[in-house]
């Protein structure tokens, strides 16, 4: 693999993916919030790739935070060769922020992307007009042995997004599709880690919160992908896929079609003094007693919404337990409901537990919001109403709602 001369200070960190394709990305473990909203305790990777053919090709750039490492990686792989082409699949700044730095260092480089992408580059202040080569759906470019085909992927998850497919090797440069939160730590391939155990939750949380709204567009891309002989997937975040690709594609089909991965219950509660939490705990215990132990219970005030959204996509049933607050839905619960709406969560069974010491309105408000603002939500007719704290008087309604939820699990969600 290419290296700098002995004595140089460059500290490149690259991985060879195939005989002429290199990963030149970098990890960021300092960033607390992805898009300044989603916690990423395990960090994130910004992936970019260099192809060494008769012509050299860089696929995307990297976030400003890792620009120095990224540039050193690119130069190390080029090993003195010019950079002939930069293909921009996605203009979001976490992948395009270093674009101008690349062009300053390589005045010879031509930039290949689509019309909408070039519009966005100009909006972000990049000077690309004198180097732009516009491509559209179905166009191809030959760089020597390798031919790259360009496939539009609008709203996955920005309007200009596209993916690039190396028809020679079956490598899909998939932009933000098939991405994952989490720094790579040297392990570039998904088969170098226990992905299902250690990475799948972050892959789901990434998809559902970043791309989740655009399921129909993702399904369109998956249909296009199914016509390709994909042997490797190189996303802009997270591990590269070279094995078990159908398994990961199947996860995407579930998420993009808003179909649950498994029968289970996401139980989210909003409680000020512990009384609504107690009722939620009783509900969970009775559910488990009757054989449904796949229950995942969260305090909406403590757990970040991104984790709740991830589980809302994963499980078939959602139970919302909330106290009334200023004659309204508890603000943190309202935030969760709003995120579910924005991210298009649909086709779920929902149970409601409401609490209020006076004027208990939250159950009706949540019911109406789910019914009016969201798609395909089946709200269980049996609900539980508590006035301040649970009493024996609520045992019957609690049991009825448990039974209603279990009965609904036997039904086939259409």
Model-derived regions: residue spans:
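Short, Lys/Arg-enriched N-terminal segments with co-localized hydrophobic residues
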Residues: 1-10
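Metallo-beta-lactamase
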Residues: 15-19, 112-161, 214-220
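Active-site neighborhood of phospho(di)ester-bond hydrolases with catalytic His/Asp-centered motifs
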Residues: 59-61, 83-91, 111-114, 172-176, ...
């Amino acid at each position: 693999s290419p290296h700098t001369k002995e004595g140089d200070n460059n500290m490149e960190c690259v991985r060879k993916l195939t005989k002429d394709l290199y990963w030149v990305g970098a990890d960021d473990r300092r960033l607390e919030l992805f898009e300044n909203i989603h916690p990423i305790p395990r960090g994130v990777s910004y992936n970019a790739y260099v192809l060494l053919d008769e012509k050299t090709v860089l696929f995307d750039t990297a976030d400003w935070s890792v620009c120095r490492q990224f540039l050193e990686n690119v130069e190390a792989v080029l090993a003195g060769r010019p950079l002939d082409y930069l293909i921009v699949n996605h203009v979001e700044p976490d992948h395009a922020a270093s674009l101008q730095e690349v062009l300053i260092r390589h005045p010879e480089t031509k930039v290949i992307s689509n019309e909408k992408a070039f519009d966005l580059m100009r909006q972000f202040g990049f000077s690309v007009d004198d180097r732009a080569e516009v491509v559209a759906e179905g166009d191809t470019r030959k760089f020597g042995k390798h031919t790259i085909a360009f496939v539009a992927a609008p709203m996955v998850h920005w309007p200009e997004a596209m993916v690039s497919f190396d028809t020679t090797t079956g490598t899909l440069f998939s932009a933000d599709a098939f991405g994952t939160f989490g720094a790579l730590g040297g392990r570039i391939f998904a088969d170098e880690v226990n992905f299902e155990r250690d990475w799948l939750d972050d892959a789901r949380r990434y998809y559902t919160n970043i791309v989740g709204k655009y399921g129909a567009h993702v399904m369109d891309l998956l249909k296009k992908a199914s016509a390709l002989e994909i042997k490797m997937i190189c996303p802009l975040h997270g591990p590269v896929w070279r094995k078990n690709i159908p398994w990961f594609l199947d996860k995407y089909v579930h998420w993009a079609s808003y179909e649950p991965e498994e029968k289970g219950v996401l139980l989210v509660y909003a409680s000020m003094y512990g009384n609504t939490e107690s009722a939620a705990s009783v509900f969970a215990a009775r559910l488990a007693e009757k054989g449904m132990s796949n229950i995942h219970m969260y305090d909406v005030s403590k757990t970040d919404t991104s984790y709740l959204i991830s589980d809302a996509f994963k499980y078939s049933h959602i139970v919302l337990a909330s106290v009334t607050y200023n004659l309204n839905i508890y603000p943190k619960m309202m935030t969760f409901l709003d995120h579910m709406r924005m991210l298009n969560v649909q086709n779920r069974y929902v149970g409601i537990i409401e609490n209020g010491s006076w004027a208990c309105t939250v159950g009706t408000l949540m019911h109406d919001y789910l019914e009016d603002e969201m798609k395909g939500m089946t709200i269980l007719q049996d609900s539980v109403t508590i006035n301040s704290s649970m009493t024996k008087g609520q045992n019957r309604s609690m049991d009825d709602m448990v039974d209603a939820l279990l009965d609904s699990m036997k039904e086939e969600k259409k």
